[in-house]
Regions:
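Short, Lys/Arg-enriched N-terminal segments with co-localized hydrophobic residues
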Residues: 1, 10, 16-27
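A short, small-residue-rich loop immediately preceding and capping a beta-strand
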Residues: 132-153, 165-168
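Generic low-complexity segments that are intrinsically disordered, proline-rich and/or Lys/Arg-biased
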Residues: 5-11, 547
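Intrinsically disordered, low-complexity serine/threonine-rich segments
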Residues: 5, 22-23, 167
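Catalytic or ion-coupling anion/metal-binding cores of large enzyme and transporter domains
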Residues: 25-73, 80-101, 106-107, 112-117, ...
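Glycine-rich, highly charged phosphate/nucleotide-binding loops
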Residues: 117-126
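Short intrinsically disordered, low-complexity coil segments enriched in acidic
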Residues: 1-7, 34
Length: 588
């Protein structure tokens, strides 16, 4: 159902998949800034950076890094950039490294900093576009690793549309905590806070969690947003196999970075090199969404895939995602989830993303294996080389975790344009639920209320005015959802919000409610005690209040004054759309 918007440029594609290509004989994109008499001053500036005569004949590779030492997913990327730049030089290219910002959602969680997280995605996209346009690189390798950085770089890459490979920093290993029988991660610490409040654990146990759950560099362990998006890059064909699952601190990862660097130089040297949009097409986009449902990715992937599709010129409706979910068996369940689940390291050990795709492709109509990839092979050629599903970490089609995908899109009067729930992480007892609304006007208010005992069994927590426009910035709700879990209410309390959730969230947590409260959505008219009905199997969420009463409430509703009136967030709020369109910025 996906289609391109506008005319497609004709592209010569060598072979069945791939862009094997010939050595370039025509002008390079970088010649715009380095060739000819008029570019003598430009060459003078580049010589000041260390270039010699022979370097002006080589392809220029933009190395888009997101290094910062405050973010564990990015603290090692300075070294990664060095490894990749060295490999580019060895392969005959000239690397030019530049940086984007990177916000750690975990560190920004639960305070005003979280308002900047989603908004940072747009800054990252703009930065990639700006650097790659002001300095016309022949190709680009992107080194993202955290939640908004992956989609932000993807959006920027779509705008530039030059040969591009994504080579992420890799996932963090799972934590091993004394006294805890299962693997731990960031989510374990958040839940530990609530458990400490009600004396389920003591100070020493909480400190042990704090010190061991996040053992080293990498994107947070688990199928959270960053790891989900890095995995989807493999299915999109814009990353080599292993991008989403090879551990950040492993020797295998170092070789992965070198291999990606060598390959981007090969692409740049081709006579007719494939560009980013040659990989991110309607067919590869559908492949990525099927993978998302098969592995039960983060609910935030819905938000980001819609935004990337918009930049790629693809028309994708949120309803399309639910149709794919209904048809896609969930065959791999990685933390965080309910019941039996595994960790990213285990998934990598049994074949990673290619093994998941190999199994899901056995169901007719699921995967289009003819999609090209940056490796030069088709997607089918790539996953054909993967091991068969092991039956435990990656289940077979005849024994899935569920017949439907891990994410579900719900509709109803409370979310006329849709909302999202990670169905794979919902307690079976909460798949259908009806309860009274307990309303909070912000995440901060909700955290205080939940920890203060204002939420009881059976309630439906409503957190509103936290959408892209109303927040502004659409804060993640990991803290309140973790507090619900930590207080032992995960199997009896639901949460509904126009904000979003961390990929670490699990439980009956329904987010991305559209239209949001700030845009006049019905969620802004809910009153304390109103009954809310949730039916995930039938994809509905509704406010059980007579239409006449709703109409009267709507008459008295007025838009609220913006929470922030200066700076970037004020600009962001004025341009942001609701979640059903990816929360992208629209300029009238």
């Amino acid at each position: 159902r996906f289609r391109a918007i506008g005319p497609e440029e004709p592209r010569a594609v060598a072979g069945g998949g791939g862009f094997s290509g010939n050595i370039r004989r025509t002008a390079m994109r970088s010649d715009i800034m380095k060739k000819g008499l008029e570019r003598t001053p430009h060459r003078g500036l580049m010589r000041a950076t260390g270039l010699a005569d022979e370097d002006f004949k080589k392809p220029y590779i933009g190395v888009c890094n997101s290094y910062t030492n405050i973010v564990p997913g990015h603290c090692h990327l300075k070294k990664v950039g060095e490894i990749i730049c060295d490999a580019i030089r060895e392969a005959g290219g000239v690397p030019y490294e530049f940086n984007t910002i990177a916000v750690c959602d975990g560190i920004a969680m639960g305070h005003s900093g979280m308002k900047y997280s989603l908004a940072s995605r747009e800054i990252i996209a703009d930065s990639v576009e700006t650097m790659g346009s002001a300095h016309p690189f022949d190709a680009m390798i992107c080194i993202p690793n955290c939640d908004k950085v992956v989609p932000g770089m993807l959006m920027g890459a779509m705008r530039l549309n030059i040969p591009t490979i994504f080579a992420s920093g890799g996932p963090m290993r799972a934590g091993k905590t004394e006294g805890v029988s299962h693997n731990t991660d960031l989510n374990s610490i958040f839940e530990g806070v609530a458990a400490r409040v009600v004396d389920k654990i003591d100070d020493a146990q909480l400190h042990e969690l704090e010190c061991t759950a996040c053992p080293g560099p990498g994107s947070c362990s688990g199928m959270f947003t960053a790891n989900s998006m890095n995995c989807l890059c493999e299915a999109l064909g814009i990353a080599l196999p292993g991008n989403g699952t090879i551990a950040a601190d492993s020797p295998e990862r170092v070789e992965y970075w070198r291999r990606a660097a060598r390959r981007i130089v090969e692409l740049a040297k081709m006579e007719n090199p494939p560009r980013a949009k040659d990989f991110v097409t309607a067919k590869s986009f559908r492949n990525a969404l099927v993978l998302d449902m098969a592995m039960g990715g983060s609910s935030n992937t819905v938000l980001h895939t819609l935004a990337v599709a918009n930049e790629a010129g693809l028309k994708v409706d949120i309803k399309d995602l639910d149709e794919i979910s209904k048809a896609t068996p969930n065959i791999c369940r990685l933390a965080p989830s309910r019941g039996e689940f595994h960790i990213v390291e285990e998934c990598n050990r049994v074949g990673g993303i290619m093994a998941i795709l190999k199994e899901i492709a056995k169901k007719p109509g699921m995967i289009d294996g003819s999609a090209p990839t940056v490796s030069g092979k088709t997607l089918a050629e790539q996953y054909a080389a993967a091991p068969d599903a092991d039956g435990t970490v990656i289940r077979t089609l005849d024994n899935p975790y569920s017949e439907k995908g891990g994410l579900a899109i719900l509709f109803g009067n409370l979310a006329e344009n849709g909302c999202v729930v990670k169905a794979a992480g919902v307690d079976p007892k909460m798949l259908v639920h009806k309860g009274p609304a307990v309303i909070f006007e912000s995440q901060e208010e909700a955290c205080e209320g939940i920890l203060g005992g204002k939420v009881r069994e059976g309630d439906v927590v409503v957190i509103r005015y936290e959408g892209p426009k109303g927040g502004p910035g659409m804060q993640e709700m990991l803290a309140p959802t973790s507090y619900i879990m930590g207080r032992g209410l995960g199997s009896s309390v639901a949460l509904v919000t126009d904000g979003r959730f961390s990929g670490a969230t699990h439980g009956a947590c329904i987010g991305h409610v559209s239209p949001e409260a700030a845009a006049g959505g019905l969620i802004g008219l809910v009153e304390p005690g109103d009954m809310i009905e949730i039916d995930i199997p039938n994809r509905t969420v509704r406010l059980d209040v007579p239409e006449a009463v709703i109409a009267e409430r709507r008459k008295s509703w007025k838009p609220r004054e913006p929470k922030i009136k200066t700076g970037y967030l004020a600009k962001y709020a004025s341009l942001a759309t609701s979640a059903d369109t990816g929360g992208v910025l629209k300029v009238n």
